[in-house]
Amino acid sequence: AVQMAQTARQQGGHPQIKSLAASIITDQQAEIAQMTPIAQKLGVKPDAVPLGGQMSGGMMSDAQALGISMSQMGMSMNMSSLGTARPFDRAFIDMMIPHHQGAVRMAHAELAKGTNPQLRALARRIVTAQDREIGAMNQWRARWYGATSPAGGMPQG
C-alpha cells in the first residue's frame, strides 16, 4: 500500500487521490510501528511486502493459515504497472481497493481468532478506516469514470 500511495502522491491527477495517498502512507507507517514491537514481544519475525509487491513466504503462510488466498489479500496485482497506467487515478483505485479488502479480511480474521488485545484494537481501527476509504474510492471512481471498482466494496467479516 505504501509503494502504491507514494506513486499516487506523485502521479495522482485528482487532489482527493493525492490526499488519500498521503493518509495511507501515514496510517500504514503508524500501523507498522505499532505492530513491530508487538511481533517482537510475541517472538514473531515481521514480514514485509517487497518493492515488487509480492508477498514473502511468511506472509503467504500466515494468510493461508487464516484461510485467505493471495487474491483475497489484494496481492495478486502487478504494482510495477501502476506507474504507467492510464488513467492513473482509476488504476490506483482499482489496485488499492482489493489491497484494502485484503487488509480488512486479515483484520476480520484477527478479530475472529486473535487473542492479543493490542492487535484486536488495531484490527478494529483498520476495518473502520479502510471501510471509509473503500467507500470514498468507489464514490470517486463512479463520479470520475462512470462505475465503481470491479472489486466491489467492503468485504463482510
Can you say where each PLM-predicted feature lies in the sequence?
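His/Met- and acidic-residue-enriched segments that coordinate or traffic transition-metal cofactors
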Residues: 1-157
